[in-house]
Regions:
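Ubiquitin-like/PB1-type beta-grasp interaction modules and other compact soluble beta-rich domains
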Residues: 1-96
C-alpha cells in the first residue's frame, strides 16, 4: 500500500531543497530511514552531504528528525514507522566550538 506524508524543511534543508514543504509517496512499511533515502535521491548531492554525516552514514548528528511532533530518538530511531498523513520535520543541528 502507498502512503502519503509531508516533509517540512527548516533552515539549510529548506534552502537546499528549495521548498518549505514536500509531499512524498512511500511504500509500506515505511520507515524514517526509507524516507530519508528517498529525499537524498530526490534533492541535490549537497542536500545529502549536509543531511548525512559522511563518517557515520547517519543523519542524526546533523538533524533533529520529528515524526508526528516527536523526535525519533524517543521512538525507534531510523526504524520509526511512518504512517499515512504523518508530518516529518527536518531541523538542522548547529555545532560549534
Amino acid at each position: 500500500m502507498v502512503i502519503h506524508v509531508e516533509v517540512r524543511f527548516l533552515g539549510i534543508f529548506q534552502r537546499l531543497s528549495g521548498k518549505k514543504r514536500f509531499k512524498l509517496k512511500l511504500e509500506e512499511p515505511a520507515t524514517v530511514r526509507k524516507l530519508l533515502m528517498k529525499l537524498t535521491e530526490t534533492f541535490s548531492s549537497e542536500f545529502k552531504q549536509v543531511l548525512v554525516d559522511s563518517q557515520l552514514g547517519d543523519p542524526r548528528p546533523n538533524a533533529l528528525i520529528l515524526v508526528g511532533g516527536k523526535e525519533i530518538s524517543a521512538l525507534q530511531g531510523l526504524e520509526t514507522l511512518v504512517k499515512d498523513a504523518d508530518e516529518i520535520v527536518l531541523v538542522p543541528m548547529v555545532h560549534g566550538g
